[in-house]
Amino acid sequence: MAAMVTLGLATPLAAQSTEGPRIVARAGRHALLVDGQPFLMLAAQVNNSSNYAAALPQVWPMLDRIHANTIEIPVAWQQIEPVEGQFDFTFLQTLLDQARAHDKRVVLLWFATWKNTSPGYTPDWVKLDNRRFPRMKTRGGQDHYALTPMARTTLEADKRAFVRLMTYLKEHDPQNTVIMVQPENEVGSYRNPRDFSAAAQRLFEQPVPEALTRKLGKPRGNWSTVFGAQADRAFNSWYTARYINEIVEAGKAVKPLPMYVNAALAGPSNVPDPDGVASGGPQQDVLDIWKVAAPAIDAEAPDIYDRASRNVGLYLDAYARPDNPLLVPEIGNGREFARYFYEALGHGAIGFAPFGMDDTGFFNYPLGAKALDDSTLQAFAGPYGAVAGVMRDWAKAAFEHPTWGAAKPDDGGDRETVLGDWRIRAEFGQWQFGEKSWTWLKSEPAPWKAEPVGGMAVVQLSRDEFLMVGDHVRARFEPAVPDPKAMIVRVEQGHFTDGRWVMDRIWNGDQTDYGINIVDRPVVLKVVMGRYH
């Protein structure tokens, strides 16, 4: 007889099936609701120039190959309003039609005033008219490359185009193929921490808004007094966030989809150099400024291209906050980045997306992969494929229960946590059979021992039950306090049917005597712990 466990949500969530996508929070955890139920974005972002119909045939097979359920793709201001006041949504309609045909959800990336801080995706009539749409001024009074967030003319033009975009979605996407929107992209300014124009300087010398000093617990004063060496950057963060918040409010008034902004990061723990960072963007140390300045934005999110495991963990820690749902809208598509999917799940992430996932022939190494060969693609396809079969159920469980995840650290050491009565440890670089402490049975090192692969994620379903997924990992479940009566009662491989866990087979003997070992075939397991009396 099949062993079953039911995962359910409280009625107030389950009853919202006719509502559009939205993000909800409970007990410090978050869920993206799509069609009324939690949804985990197993996403992939295409290259920057794949936002044309001619490129789409090189996109869908790649998404299918890695079992992605969501595409992140740009729609550029220059693309929909090449002539001021004349809008063309041909590509957007093509995208909607093809996404539906390929059973993919869509996250639209609005490349407008800022794309990686640049105005490159603005229409020609914007980028060539510096009087009407002014750039920032440097300390020396010269034009900088980035548009200033102080210009009402630029804001109104961007907002008008964005509202037209959202209006088109309202009229042509009632089924919510598009589930989320990213207004702008990696905002801010490099090598110039703020606008130094006369108008901006006057604002800089005024008192910091009281709402911000109150939130930060700082005394009143002007920007220099309150923020010291980071004053220019704090100022630019505030006004950039206010600019985008107004765009988001206008767009949501038409169609209230969840909206997030993404951050070009500047190191996981250092205080950034205002002239070296994308000043104005939502880096982790200015998140509180963004939260006060832009309450309409649902999340600030990290774009992660740092390969170091310690740094990735710090970024995930910083952005997974009770007031900020975690999603990773961009991460490198090199093979070693795939392991961080598990750590993101362990932080309760609502989405994860390697960048540059299409077959157009462009690779952004050294940020990402040198090539999308089979081993690279399989590193993402394996975890995505395992979770895809339980995607809704995992998302529900992660919203209702504690989670933990670990990626193989760069030093190959163990990772562990305690959930309730049980200690969970992830070990790496071992064969599936036997113990590394054995001296009587010789073995060669596991081929993957030196490779940056492997990880696991768990959800604690009840006091003694866990849902887990992983690859290239040995998982050990033990009592948090030594207890000779404690044991693994059962390890089940299975699936969900209508929200109920159905056991396909029980792992026992060699499959559990040396920990729970998963190598190159990620699977979802239910682990039941207990004690005999």
How would you describe each model-predicted region?
Residues 56-132, 240-256:
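Aromatic-lined substrate-binding rim segments of carbohydrate-active enzymes
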Residues 131-287:
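Polysaccharide-binding and catalytic clefts of secreted carbohydrate-active enzymes
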Residues 431, 435-458, 463-533:
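C-terminal beta-sandwich/jelly-roll accessory domains of carbohydrate-active enzymes
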Residues 16-69:
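N-terminal carbohydrate-binding accessory modules
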Residues 49-65, 275-293, 311-312, 338-341:
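Short, acidic/polar
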Residues 104, 246-257, 285-393:
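Catalytic-core region of carbohydrate-active enzymes that cleave or remodel glycosidic bonds
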Residues 342-477:
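Aromatic- and carboxylate-lined catalytic core of secreted/periplasmic carbohydrate-active enzymes
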Residues 36, 71, 99, 165, ...:
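Conserved, mostly hydrophobic/aromatic
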